[in-house]
Each structure stands twice: as structure tokens, then as C-alpha cells.
């Protein structure tokens, strides 16, 4: 995605990043983009051709639910997984609010470290409240990461802004059922191989 669109930037920082983008668009020898949507953006706004090089991943092995069962009581197909950075544009607040309105015995696992403010993390935890179905694992890697992907019932990515999400590519490589927001950076990855829901901001705009 375009960095200046991220919610964490204030007005001055946003303008500064937009200025940097314009300079790069006009002066760079080559521009590499991760998504076709951003490629079209540079063409439309700056009449600038770019080179599209998508992200790639290594195929990881399937794992039984050992570490995740010991740490959080997770078993095969008994949880819904979000995995990514804990930042506003990932749509985690929407996800928690929607999940709390469901009547399910599935757990919601929110896995990942925060690169945003402590205040935002506290807001998410307050929203989760005393719903003991919601589990925060913090940053994970290695075999624990592989176990979470291998045993998830559903992988969900409700983002408002993405580049080309590595976690979505990884989830698809494990054969997970994926549920994603309708932003182009997600839909061009999943094509017709996932459940796509209307982006929350678009829903608000249409109401």
C-alpha cells in the first residue's frame, strides 16, 4: 500500500511522505511495486511505468497442534486465526467486534506483535473485554507459527490497507479457508479462491 495512507501518520508526516512519493515518481530510475493496484496508481497519478514484482514465500511443512495446545489450548479446527502486525489498518477492531457478535465455540486467535502505540494495543484488549474465546499470542515465529497456520479453521484478514500480505500468501499455502476484505491488494492475491467481504470503510460510506 501507500505509506502515507496509514492511520498512524499525522497531517505533517502524511504531507511529507506524499512529497517523497512525488519526488521518487519523477526522479527514480526504476520503481518496484508489490501490487497491480499500486502499479495503476502510479500510472494514473504520475504517468509513470513501474515494475511489478510480487512477494513470494517458501512452502512450510504442516505441523500437529503441540506447542499451541500446550500454550493456549488450541486444537485442529477449533480457532479462527488472524496473523499480522497489530496496527489500526489491519482492521483488528472490526474483527473483534464482529466476532463478539457471533455465537460460536471457536476461539479467535490474534497473533502478532505491535508496531503501533501502547494505546492502540490497550484499545484492542479493552474491546476484547472478558470474552475468553479471544486469545492474544504476541509475536510468534518458527514451529509455533507453522502450527497456527496448519490447524486453523479459518484465516481472516480484514485490512483497510496492504501491500501484498505475506501472511495471506502463507495461509493460502497451507490450504486455509481465507476470509479477506475487498481491498484490491487482497482480492488480486486470492482471486476467486477465498471468501471476500466488503471493506468496513466502504460499508460506512454506503450507509
Model-identified regions with their sequence ranges:
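Carbohydrate-associated surface elements
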Residues: 37, 56
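Short hydrophobic beta-strand element within catalytic cores of glycosyltransferases
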Residues: 173, 177-180
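Aromatic "clamp/platform" in nucleotide-sugar-dependent glycosyltransferases that forms part
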Residues: 160
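Short alpha-helical donor nucleotide-sugar binding micro-motif in glycosyltransferases
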Residues: 139-140, 147-152
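Membrane-proximal helix-turn-helix segments that form the acceptor-binding/catalytic region
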Residues: 13-30
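Conserved acidic donor-binding segment of nucleotide-sugar-dependent glycosyltransferases
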Residues: 194-202
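Nucleotide-activated donor-binding/catalytic signature segment of Leloir-type glycosyltransferases, i.e.
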Residues: 121-143
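A conserved mid-protein helix/loop that constitutes part of the nucleotide-sugar donor-binding site
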Residues: 78, 82, 87-101, 119
Amino acid at each position: 500500500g501507500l505509506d502515507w495512507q496509514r492511520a498512524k501518520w499525522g497531517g505533517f508526516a502524511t504531507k511529507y511522505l506524499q512529497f517523497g512519493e512525488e519526488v521518487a515518481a519523477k526522479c527514480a530510475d526504476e520503481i518496484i511495486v508489490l501490487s497491480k493496484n499500486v502499479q495503476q496508481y502510479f500510472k494514473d497519478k504520475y504517468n509513470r511505468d513501474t515494475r511489478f514484482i510480487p512477494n513470494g514465500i517458501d512452502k512450510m511443512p504442516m505441523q500437529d497442534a503441540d506447542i499451541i495446545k500446550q500454550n493456549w489450548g488450541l486444537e485442529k479446527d477449533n480457532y479462527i486465526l488472524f496473523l499480522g502486525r497489530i496496527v489500526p489498518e489491519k482492521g483488528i477492531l472490526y474483527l473483534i467486534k464482529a466476532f463478539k457478535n457471533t455465537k460460536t465455540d471457536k476461539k479467535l486467535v490474534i497473533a502478532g506483535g505491535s508496531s503501533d502505540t501502547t494505546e492502540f494495543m490497550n484499545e484492542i484488549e479493552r474491546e476484547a473485554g472478558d470474552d475468553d474465546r479471544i486469545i492474544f499470542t504476541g509475536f510468534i515465529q518458527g514451529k509455533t507459527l507453522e502450527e497456527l497456520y496448519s490447524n486453523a479453521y479459518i484465516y481472516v484478514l480484514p485490512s483497510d490497507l496492504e501491500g501484498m500480505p505475506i501472511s495471506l500468501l502463507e495461509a493460502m499455502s497451507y490450504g486455509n479457508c481465507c476470509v479477506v476484505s475487498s481491498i484490491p491488494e487482497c482480492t488480486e492475491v486470492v482471486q476467486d479462491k477465498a471468501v471476500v467481504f466488503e471493506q468496513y470503510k466502504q460499508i460506512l460510506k454506503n450507509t
